[in-house]
Amino acid sequence: MKKTLLAALLISTGPALAGTAGVNSGSSMTTGPSSSALSLQSATHNPAMTSLVVPDKERWRISYLPSFGANTELGDVNNFYDDLDELIDIVDDPTSTQDPASEVLNRFNTTLESLGESGYLKGSLSFGLPILPLVHNTNYHDSSIGISAGVLAQFGLQVLDSDLTFDDQNGTFSTATSLYLKSGLEKSITLSYSRPILDTPALDFARPGKLYGGMSARLISLELSKQVSPIQQLDGNDVSDIITDEYDSNLNETTNIAFSAGVVWDVGRYQVGFTFENINSPEFDYGPIGTDCANRTENTPSRSSCEAAARFIQQDGRIRARETHTMHARTRIDGLYHFTNKWSASGSIDLAAYDDIVGFENQWLHLATMYNFDNNILPALRVGLQSNLTGTQLSSLTVGMSLFKFATLDLEYGLNSTSIDGSSAPRRFGIALGVEERF
């Protein structure tokens, strides 16, 4: 093929990447959504943290430049893309292999079954706007207000497998196997408010502390699209065009509002937070697929994609023509403990599983530790572990550093591996950058 399937997919999903669960930006790639006043991103995870991310003697805190986060995740199928590329070549040109037809059928029917069960590619991307998040401590009842905005995205690619067959008379291979791509583009702006709501007395296990409460409203514009692309139409020269065209034609945009609330108990040496996200469970519709195929021009990729979708909808029931994504209400607890003035540890856990916008199940556990240094060049280092407790059940090691007291760089490296081009590679990998005021 002139263009490998992997490269074509990365190019073609560019317009789509521009979801929700999937990637934490800035230092929260390592620490997760924990209640740490050192990170401005904490105010975007728990609205009650809006009161804590600005020091007492300050009134404002901002993020200088856009924050960025991206990660990818691969299914547990070795040489996923190599096998798909080779199969597309054989279907397009049977003379590209010298193996007997029986061997090709035995090999690829086994491979297709494996691809259908475990083969997938998922990617997530987030961008925050310059200056935002912006948090202001007011003089009114020690309350704080915050505003944040950004672009979040996600795509998920899976294989809808079908048997490979051989026509002895024509000497050709054929299969209804198709690629199933779901993607979304979310643009949002969030307003948050928080204030102290209770002074807590000294207890046997805690010093006097303060309980903060917060709430937020997030206006969301979410574009969702899904498509089915038969691999027989992917000849390697127009993969990007086919996927991009179908993304546009199946696109549907929905606008809704998500409300969240949270509390943080601050006792100085440690903090405990509780977040209740998407209280109203907002809904967003995907564009329909596999409908009105007769109205599309015959012998075109659009017609083939529509008919392939209709087949898997009507005969197999593996996908649905019309689908609604619900951002289900979910809860999370987190904690932060300071061993010393420089060394701390944090953790957070989702209390229930939920689906991201491309249908993958998530329930994340984050553990991290951070050490602060007395220098301006490398003021902090952090190391973390995150694990999806359901769904794909993958785990990753995360590391990060703060640079020059305003920049953050964090990396994610999966602990599970697969094979790509004969070499071992992590099934998850991510990177996050941020530039914000740090105190």
For the regions a language model picked out, list residue spans one by one.
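Subset of outer-membrane beta-barrel
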Residues: 19-439
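Gram-negative bacterial Sec-dependent N-terminal signal peptides
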Residues: 1-18
